[in-house]
Amino acid sequence: MSRVAKAPVTVPAGVEVTLNEQTLTVKGSKGSLTRVINNAVNVVIEDAQVKFLPVDGVSNAWAQAGTARALVNNMVVGVSQGFVKKLKLVGVGYRAKIAGSDLDLTLGFSHPLVHKLPAGVTAECPSQTEIVLSGVDKQVVGQVAAEIRGYRPPEPYKGKGVRYDDEIVRRKEAKKK
């Protein structure tokens, strides 16, 4: 059995956590996030800690409590520090630039790709082959990074494509005659 739910979430200074029935709101210096907590979980907020207790008689209550604890911890980290995903474009002619709230990508297709950034995610391009995505919601930042990577995933023969900064692409040997 996982024991994630047994550890409380510590709320740092400058972050405010409020609970209204099953809706939990976390406010911090970078913004605010709201999430509805499952009914199988009781949430208790006391002395800068958020505790998650399973409801008796519900079969998967411990699992739901562990999930809620992990999600709320990500919310607290997001509004206090934020989340960052870095992408690299590897390939001849692969470029990225920012136009307002859009990301213009040239990835070897016959047409340029325009990716609209959702609210809460900001992008910057330190160079034409680097993209830095940042935001308060870990799920949204990761989803946007995965969508951009999905346009041209790294291929195993030459390693061309869009990859995460810390991603290691397993290379294959070319076919021998």
Curated annotation (Swiss-Prot):
Q: Which GO terms describe its cellular component?
A: cytosolic large ribosomal subunit
Per its UniProt record, what NCBIfam families does this chain match? L6_bact
Task: Tell me which Gene Ontology terms the entry assigns under biological process.
Answer: cytoplasmic translation
General function of this protein: This protein binds to the 23S rRNA, and is important in its secondary structure. It is located near the subunit interface in the base of the L7/L12 stalk, and near the tRNA binding site of the peptidyltransferase center.
The keyword rRNA-binding appears for this protein: yes
Source species, domain of life: Bacteria
- Record carries keyword RNA-binding: yes
- Alphabetized UniProt keyword annotations: Ribonucleoprotein, Ribosomal protein, RNA-binding, rRNA-binding
User: Which organism encodes this protein?
Assistant: Shewanella frigidimarina (strain NCIMB 400)
Q: What is this protein called?
A: Large ribosomal subunit protein uL6
Q: Which InterPro entries match?
A: Ribosomal_uL6-like, Ribosomal_uL6-like_a/b-dom_sf, Ribosomal_uL6_a/b-dom, Ribosomal_uL6_bac-type, Ribosomal_uL6_CS
User: Would you identify the family this protein belongs to, as annotated?
Assistant: Belongs to the universal ribosomal protein uL6 family.
Q: How the protein assembles, per its UniProt entry?
A: Part of the 50S ribosomal subunit.
Q: Name one GO molecular function term.
A: rRNA binding
A Pfam family it matches: Ribosomal_L6
